[in-house]
Amino acid sequence: MILSLFKLFGKENFFIQDSYLESPILWIDSTILIQVIGFLKKNNTCSYEILFDLFGIDERTRKNVKSFPNADFTVSYYFFSISNNSDLILKVALLKEHLQLPTISSIFLNANWYEREIWDMFGIVFNNHPYLTRILMPKNWVGHPLRKDYSSHATEFDEFYFTKQKEDLAMESLKFCPKSWGLENNDSNNSEYMFLNFGPNHPSSHGAFRIVLQLHGEKIINCIPDIGYHHRGAEKIAERQTWHSYIPYTDRIEYLGGCVNEMPYILAVEKLAGIVVPEKVQVIRILLSELFRINSHLLFLSTFIQDIGSMSTVFLAFTDRQKIYDLIESITGARMHPAWFRIGGVAKDLPKNWNSLLKKFLIWMPKRLDYYVNIAIKNKILISRSKGIAAYGKKEALSWGITGAGLRATGVNFDVRKNRPYSGYQNFDFEVPIGNNISDAYTRVLLKIEEIRQSLKILNQCLLHMPLGSYKSDHPLSTPQKKNKSLFHIERMITHFLQMSWGPIIPSNESFQMIEATKGINSYYLISDGLTTSYRTRIRTPSFAHLQQIPSVIRGYVISDLIVYLGSIDFVMSDVDR
């Protein structure tokens, strides 16, 4: 592909960057951006069907830039080819005097929200964008938070007083004006539309999430998702926390996923540090990840059934989830957010009784799952409410950057654990459930149930084949180092003290890790400048892409169908807003 780009656009228009990424990174000039991206999408040899991620970088305080093109800011386009299982990253350098790029939202539909986020966080303008407004920050916010000259400490700001004038401005910004959202008041027959706020505090919106609905009678003509109510500045926080002390924050990106969220961050840091962990560490990480996957899927399954009108499954599923939490707590000492993975290993070795607790759960859960299928999933009302509802195909899924069960329901056989195995998943025997070309609400639920069965299969293999050995690498950047190492000599004690107080110094470079998270593909793109903190931490979450697709899927349906659709997506707003 790179040779084809050189031949078509001229080698002099590209700069190849070295990194720890398996994917090539090409810097290109903004004048050929649209042509290059159009070629990547339509190329017959290797088509990059998915714009996987799109994010900005403030380069102004970065020291280790090697021979990179001169840039104050950089915009990175991460393309993903499902058919060839390959990636390509394009970077465009920008100077602060000209922070403008052409929008690519007409080529990749999902670029819309990503470009809005970049403008929101960095102030980079995308010309001809259909709706370039703030997306995560309040509309009356001043400044662009991910710029390096925007402080991450509240103590460095002036004192804040919420005056009556500020309150009025805040309330005014929340008022709904259809035209400002690109919506018409009347149809072609001059019939007036009704506009309805669904959320941000509706029980079926699954979090602080607002959808503005344009209705003609009961039919949804259009809708606009409004996100950002749960934004906590997770990427900004990473710039002030050490590589080690940021681990607890990863748990809370998708707060149901627990250790699953820690996996991509830890693996990306270990790539930067050059750490290879023992086999036992890999299997322990898989053990915890699959427990959390089942836990998350059970909540999804039970709340989906509840949204349709049946309450029993919620109470039953929470009994099962309690058993999982008891098992997780016995291993990690915590329940929802254990922050248990470490750079170079895990926090502790497995306790003595871990296998007996896991064995009991593996006996219990399969029968319980069959029970849910019989009492709810085969129910005629549930089938009629969800089968054929909110349906889309492979082309639409790829256009919107859909991953996970939503994509696999369209017949695309892609699971990161199988196609790009990490942490030793290549040593496990399990199947990837896929659908039959159309992803509707019912199919997405069926796939999640089958994914639980496959996770149980993986857990059984962890039980039977847990390796012997250490729970932590001997690498000097493993944090914290083993106690017997740090207590052996005063010099090593000093190293331990520095790593835990100031943080480990990670070599300068860039790394990337994607994983199959509970709700789709989650990834971390890390940039180290050779310091104890990350220079840039980019968190790509599946739910951000999934919610952007809502208007294209739900037009023509009614509100009750919207509730079924939202329940079938499987999202939490912390995963969307970060």
Swiss-Prot record:
<keyword id="KW-0997">Cell inner membrane</keyword>
<feature type="region of interest" description="NADH dehydrogenase I subunit C">
    <location>
        <begin position="1"/>
        <end position="167"/>
    </location>
</feature>
<dbReference type="GO" id="GO:0030964">
    <property type="term" value="C:NADH dehydrogenase complex"/>
</dbReference>
<dbReference type="GO" id="GO:0050136">
    <property type="term" value="F:NADH:ubiquinone reductase (non-electrogenic) activity"/>
</dbReference>
<feature type="region of interest" description="NADH dehydrogenase I subunit D">
    <location>
        <begin position="192"/>
        <end position="578"/>
    </location>
</feature>
<dbReference type="GO" id="GO:0051287">
    <property type="term" value="F:NAD binding"/>
</dbReference>
<keyword id="KW-1003">Cell membrane</keyword>
<dbReference type="Pfam" id="PF00329">
    <property type="entry name" value="Complex1_30kDa"/>
</dbReference>
<keyword id="KW-0874">Quinone</keyword>
<dbReference type="GO" id="GO:0008137">
    <property type="term" value="F:NADH dehydrogenase (ubiquinone) activity"/>
</dbReference>
<keyword id="KW-0830">Ubiquinone</keyword>
<keyword id="KW-0813">Transport</keyword>
<protein>
    <recommendedName>
        <fullName>NADH-quinone oxidoreductase subunit C/D</fullName>
        <ecNumber>7.1.1.-</ecNumber>
    </recommendedName>
</protein>
<comment type="similarity">
    <text>In the N-terminal section; belongs to the complex I 30 kDa subunit family.</text>
</comment>
<dbReference type="GO" id="GO:0005886">
    <property type="term" value="C:plasma membrane"/>
</dbReference>
<dbReference type="InterPro" id="IPR001135">
    <property type="entry name" value="NADH_Q_OxRdtase_suD"/>
</dbReference>
<dbReference type="InterPro" id="IPR029014">
    <property type="entry name" value="NiFe-Hase_large"/>
</dbReference>
<dbReference type="InterPro" id="IPR023062">
    <property type="entry name" value="NADH_DH_suCD"/>
</dbReference>
<comment type="subunit">
    <text>NDH-1 is composed of 13 different subunits. Subunits NuoB, CD, E, F, and G constitute the peripheral sector of the complex.</text>
</comment>
<dbReference type="InterPro" id="IPR022885">
    <property type="entry name" value="NDH1_su_D/H"/>
</dbReference>
<comment type="function">
    <text>NDH-1 shuttles electrons from NADH, via FMN and iron-sulfur (Fe-S) centers, to quinones in the respiratory chain. The immediate electron acceptor for the enzyme in this species is believed to be ubiquinone. Couples the redox reaction to proton translocation (for every two electrons transferred, four hydrogen ions are translocated across the cytoplasmic membrane), and thus conserves the redox energy in a proton gradient.</text>
</comment>
<dbReference type="GO" id="GO:0048038">
    <property type="term" value="F:quinone binding"/>
</dbReference>
<keyword id="KW-0520">NAD</keyword>
<comment type="similarity">
    <text>In the C-terminal section; belongs to the complex I 49 kDa subunit family.</text>
</comment>
<dbReference type="InterPro" id="IPR014029">
    <property type="entry name" value="NADH_UbQ_OxRdtase_49kDa_CS"/>
</dbReference>
<keyword id="KW-0511">Multifunctional enzyme</keyword>
<dbReference type="Pfam" id="PF00346">
    <property type="entry name" value="Complex1_49kDa"/>
</dbReference>
<keyword id="KW-1278">Translocase</keyword>
<dbReference type="InterPro" id="IPR037232">
    <property type="entry name" value="NADH_quin_OxRdtase_su_C/D-like"/>
</dbReference>
<dbReference type="InterPro" id="IPR001268">
    <property type="entry name" value="NADH_UbQ_OxRdtase_30kDa_su"/>
</dbReference>
<dbReference type="InterPro" id="IPR010218">
    <property type="entry name" value="NADH_DH_suC"/>
</dbReference>
<keyword id="KW-0472">Membrane</keyword>
